[in-house]
């Protein structure tokens, strides 16, 4: 994993991948700042008239239905169509799927459009796979361990990578399961850390798509980058407000060697 991470982080910072974020209004600014700090370029283009066209020139696309409107649903559908035609990797973040019927129906309708990755908490992933009812809004009520079967089903169904966020992250593809221990509990006290991880996942996939790095390792590296930055930020911050600032700084400052020393990766 270390070599893949070194290469992934280098490619993100060298290539400055352009990430189209169709995301929720609560986290839009934070997501943009996370991408910039990590070395990517954000673009919040989500209107139906422009989404498909932009997805064709972007390096990665994030679909996050956290605060959806009818117009944004249309924009998301168009962006997915544009991404698929252009071969642009797109990431699905199924926010609160299983807990709310309309977004659950929408997510179930697009999951077979071959997302390069799905990133969510355990309850969202379980619900998306049809194995449970979902959590409490953006909060998971299932453990990451419980989501393993659901993640494996979704990985086989989509051909992509499924990432389950929790105290220990789980990264699953058709023939591989990886556990990642990193981060800090303070990450849960700053809104947008999970949603921005979906955007960073799209950045890593976009930066490495033409390389020898697997999609699995690219998704793993994105999660390791965030986890290590969270640990560094927690050492410098005293409360959530200062943590948010320190987290952005750490995403910018951290190098691959530091990340490798801060995270624990286990192949199942």
UniProtKB/Swiss-Prot annotation:
InterPro entries tied to this protein: Hyethyz_kinase (IPR000417), Ribokinase-like (IPR029056)
Q: Where on this chain does ATP bind?
A: 119, 165
First-level EC class: transferase
Q: Does the keyword ATP-binding apply?
A: yes
According to its UniProt entry, this protein's organism is Corynebacterium glutamicum (strain ATCC 13032 / DSM 20300 / JCM 1318 / BCRC 11384 / CCUG 27702 / LMG 3730 / NBRC 12168 / NCIMB 10025 / NRRL B-2784 / 534)
Q: Which amino acid positions bind substrate, per UniProt?
A: 44, 192
Instruction: Return the protein name.
Output: Hydroxyethylthiazole kinase
Q: Which reaction does it catalyse?
A: 5-(2-hydroxyethyl)-4-methylthiazole + ATP = 4-methyl-5-(2-phosphooxyethyl)-thiazole + ADP + H(+)
């Amino acid at each position: 994993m270390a070599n893949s991470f070194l290469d992934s982080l280098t490619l993100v910072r060298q290539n400055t991948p352009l990430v189209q974020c169709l995301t929720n209004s609560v986290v839009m600014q934070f997501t943009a700042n996370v991408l910039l700090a990590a070395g990517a370029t954000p673009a919040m283009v989500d209107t139906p008239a422009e989404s498909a066209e932009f997805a064709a020139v972007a390096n990665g696309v994030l679909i996050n239905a956290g605060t959806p409107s009818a117009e944004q649903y249309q924009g998301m559908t168009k962006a997915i169509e544009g991404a698929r035609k252009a071969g642009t990797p797109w990431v699905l973040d199924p926010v609160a799927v299983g807990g709310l019927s309309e977004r659950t129906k929408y997510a179930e309708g697009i999951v077979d459009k071959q997302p390069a990755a799905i990133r969510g908490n355990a309850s969202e992933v379980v619900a998306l796979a049809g194995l449970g009812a979902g959590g409490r809004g953006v909060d998971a009520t299932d453990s990451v361990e419980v989501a393993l079967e659901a993640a494996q089903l979704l990985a086989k169904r989509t051909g992509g990578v499924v990432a389950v966020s929790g105290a220990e992250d789980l990264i699953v593809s058709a023939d591989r399961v990886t556990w990642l221990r990193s981060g800090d509990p303070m990450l849960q006290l700053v809104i947008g850390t999970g949603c921005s991880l979906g955007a960073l996942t799209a950045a890593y996939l976009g930066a490495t798509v033409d390389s020898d790095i697997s999609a699995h390792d690219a998704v793993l590296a994105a999660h390791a980058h965030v986890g290590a930055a969270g640990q560094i930020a927690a050492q410098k911050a005293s409360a959530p407000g200062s943590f948010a600032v320190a987290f952005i700084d750490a995403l910018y400052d951290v190098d691959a060697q530091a990340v490798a020393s801060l995270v624990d990766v286990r192949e199942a």
